[in-house]
């Protein structure tokens, strides 16, 4: 089968935003105008097509990122048919992992901001993640019909709060109830959408007199930004003071792809104004798969770095970026194809698990509807049905050209709760349900507490775990009780010290002998164990060194103070001794573990607690109560700000003090204040807190 759409006409984009900026509504409108969904789904009545899990529709927030394919040829059919793959990403702080995972496989992003609340904490998080993956992006200032909406203020926030270089391609006409349409600064014409047909048609008009001066100034900035793309444009602009429409678009495109500027558009998705212009801008200013940096991976030898270009003739390679459980077909594995072609019925190799998989059915998703396809090609986003051993972040590749694309990094959970099935019948079902949910979501972990036998689930926040338990009930029909949330404390050492670990056991016949000297140091950067082998002269044979490392690692997991894992440690093994007959790997592992245990005293061990970055938006009259309450929770106020919706308080607060905060804040402010919270870092717990935790653990 030949390719239906040339790869240059593909756009793989994500629509990212803060909760409530109107992202799902924007995506809905995109699907409506591209002709796929005939009745516009509204989030307000729980009918949006992208939000396909029951819970999302109830809570009105997007949880899973569904991938949807649609086609667009321009507002005036001015382009050839383009294929736009949209990945809808959640904006809630507890689901940051979903956003990170989507950005990893996107080529470009549309960041939706609310015209009245502008740049919010989650926007900053998404922006940082997009910078990490070097994703070119544009901004859609939505909800221009809302009270307090102000396009220019949001543009200024992009510069001040995100350090971006925003370039408005439009100016909005009016705001709030008076919002009429936008001025296209490239054409210097107003665009007014027809309300009678839900904005399907529009007309160009002259710019309103009261906006002409402002638009002329913005137009000049736009042309200047385009001229900086190359010397030819710059020289022409300096000589003639103008560029053609084509040159402006080419200049803006080149600089957007280079991540130098961020084009900004405005509108109101809910009022059917501005979304088609966003689609045009996606085609004109965001990259095709061939215009982004080719993906790199490691070949089968585990060392050689190789590149896979976005080309059908290259060997097949793809990344599994999401696993979802579908009520009708079972497990869906969403993949982004980076290179080559794959037909259903053929085999692929998963180098991360060292397993072959046979591809059965493949589908392309439109939100919750699916279309069976026979093949996927470079640039495609599709879902595979029934893959057995694939988890998020795994590579799938041609078995004859093995490559491992870079793995995604997932943060460790910061909160845990014990869950218990309500009945014996739920016991088995709960195990299956939790296993499936953990496979879908790498930031969610399940383990059994060895001492109590309880099942412990861990995640990124209270809402995250609420939704997991809710999904167990709805999708898997498992009823469960939940314990009190537990904080994921960590341990660390303050001092550098040299410790001897010696394990000797003689009991007739063959004994055990392991002896090591290890220098332990706190690690300044990174997490986990940094292990250095400085043994010389064969005082400990090198085949025992991996066992020494394993002994240290296992003890780090079990902790030295209160049974919490050690966050970071540098260990250098520099001396020791062995016995020809009695030494073995087990003896050295135990010796290393014994040395690590002694860190509790000699290493100046301390307890670390997770600190959260909290932002509260509150009416001015409740400001004193909010700040007082945060101080009571051992919070450190980092700063205060003004926003349209009230005062903004930024603080860093220990997670242990934040349980039940939503309820307390609601009652203190009659439900008028809102807050967001995300993990910031681990910090040393004060003595009185640490002592209470250590004594509770040792009972």
Swiss-Prot record:
It comes from the Bacteria. Keywords: Cytoplasm, Elongation factor, GTP-binding, Nucleotide-binding, Protein biosynthesis. PROSITE patterns: G_TR_1 (PS00301), G_TR_2 (PS51722). It holds the Pfam family GTP_EFTU. One of its GO terms (biological process) is ribosome disassembly. GO terms for molecular function: GTP binding; GTPase activity; guanosine tetraphosphate binding; translation elongation factor activity. GTP binds at residues 17-24, 88-92, 142-145. It is found in: Cytoplasm. Residues 8-290 form the tr-type G domain. Catalyzes the GTP-dependent ribosomal translocation step during translation elongation. During this step, the ribosome changes from the pre-translocational (PRE) to the post-translocational (POST) state as the newly formed A-site-bound peptidyl-tRNA and P-site-bound deacylated tRNA move to the P and E sites, respectively. Catalyzes the coordinated movement of the two tRNA molecules, the mRNA and conformational changes in the ribosome. HAMAP family: EF_G_EF_2_B. Belongs to the TRAFAC class translation factor GTPase superfamily. Classic translation factor GTPase family. EF-G/EF-2 subfamily. This is Elongation factor G 1. The lineage of its organism: Bacteria, Pseudomonadati, Pseudomonadota, Gammaproteobacteria, Oceanospirillales.
């Amino acid at each position: 089968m030949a390719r239906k759409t040339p790869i240059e006409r593909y756009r793989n984009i994500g629509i990212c935003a803060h909760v409530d900026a109107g992202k799902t509504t924007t995506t809905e409108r995109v699907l409506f105008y591209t002709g796929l969904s005939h009745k516009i789904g509204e989030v307000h009545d729980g009918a949006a097509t992208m939000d396909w899990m029951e819970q999302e529709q109830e809570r009105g927030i997007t949880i899973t990122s569904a991938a949807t394919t649609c086609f667009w040829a321009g507002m005036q059919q001015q382009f050839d048919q383009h294929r736009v793959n949209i990945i809808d990403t959640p904006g809630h702080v507890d689901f940051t992992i979903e956003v990170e995972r989507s950005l990893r496989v996107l080529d470009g992003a549309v960041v939706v901001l609310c015209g009245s609340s502008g740049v919010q904490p989650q926007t900053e998080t998404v922006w940082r993640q997009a910078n990490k993956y070097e994703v070119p992006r544009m901004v859609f200032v939505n909800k221009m019909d809302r009270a307090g909406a102000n396009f220019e203020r949001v543009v200024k926030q992009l510069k001040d709060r995100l350090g971006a270089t925003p370039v408005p391609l439009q100016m909005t006409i009016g705001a709030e109830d008076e919002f009429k349409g936008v001025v296209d600064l490239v054409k210097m014409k107003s665009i007014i959408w027809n309300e009678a047909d839900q904005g399907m048609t529009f007309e160009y008009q002259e710019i309103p007199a009261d906006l002409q001066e402002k638009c002329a100034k913005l137009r000049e900035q736009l042309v200047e930004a385009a001229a900086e793309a190359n010397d030819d444009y710059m020289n022409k602009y300096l000589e003639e003071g103008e560029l053609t429409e084509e040159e402006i678009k080419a200049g803006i495109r080149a600089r957007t792809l280079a991540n130098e500027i961020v084009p900004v558009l405005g509108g109101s998705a809910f009022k059917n104004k501005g979304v088609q212009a966003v689609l045009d801008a996606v085609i004109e200013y965001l990259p095709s798969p061939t215009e982004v940096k080719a993906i790199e991976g490691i070949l089968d030898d585990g060392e050689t770095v190789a590149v896979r270009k976005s080309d059908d003739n290259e060997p097949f390679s793809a990344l599994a970026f999401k696993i979802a459980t579908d009520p009708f077909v079972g497990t869906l594995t969403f993949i982004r194809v980076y290179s080559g072609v794959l037909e259903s019925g053929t085999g692929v190799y998963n180098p991360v698990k060292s397993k072959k998989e046979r591809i059965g059915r493949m589908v392309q998703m439109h939100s919750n509807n699916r279309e069976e396809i026979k093949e996927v090609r470079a640039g495609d986003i599709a879902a595979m049905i029934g893959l057995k051993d694939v988890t998020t972040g795994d590579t799938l590749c041609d078995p004859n050209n093995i490559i491992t694309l870079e793995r995604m990094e997932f943060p460790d959970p910061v909160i845990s709760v014990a869950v218990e099935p309500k009945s014996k019948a739920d016991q088995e079902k709960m195990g299956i349900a939790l296993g499936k949910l953990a496979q879908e979501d790498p930031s969610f972990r399940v383990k059994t507490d060895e001492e109590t036998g309880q099942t412990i689930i861990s995640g990124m926040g209270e809402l995250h775990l609420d939704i997991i338990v809710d999904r167990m009930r709805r999708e898997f029909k498992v009823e469960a009780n939940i314990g009190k949330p537990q904080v994921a404390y960590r341990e660390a050492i303050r001092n550098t010290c040299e410790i001897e670990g010696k394990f000797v056991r003689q009991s007739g016949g063959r004994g055990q002998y392991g002896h090591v000297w290890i220098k332990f140091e706190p690690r300044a950067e990174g997490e986990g164990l940094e292990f250095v082998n400085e043994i010389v002269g064969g005082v400990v044979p090198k085949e025992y060194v991996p066992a020494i490392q394993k002994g240290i690692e296992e003890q780090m997991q079990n902790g030295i103070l209160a049974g919490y894992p050690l966050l970071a440690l540098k260990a250098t093994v520099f001396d020791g001794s062995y016995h020809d007959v009695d030494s073995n790997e087990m003896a050295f592992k135990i010796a290393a573990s014994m040395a690590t245990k002694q860190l509790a005293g000699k290493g100046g061990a301390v307890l670390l607690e997770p600190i959260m970055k909290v932002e509260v938006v509150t009416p001015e009259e409740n400001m004193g109560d909010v700040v007082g309450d945060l101080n009571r929770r051992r919070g450190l106020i980092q700063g205060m700000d003004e926003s349209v919706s009230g005062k903004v308080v930024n603080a860093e607060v220990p997670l242990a003090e934040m349980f039940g905060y939503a309820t307390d804040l609601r009652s203190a402010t009659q439900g008028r204040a809102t807050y967001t919270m995300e993990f910031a870092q681990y910090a040393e717990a004060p003595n009185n807190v640490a002592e209470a935790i250590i004594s509770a653990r040792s009972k």
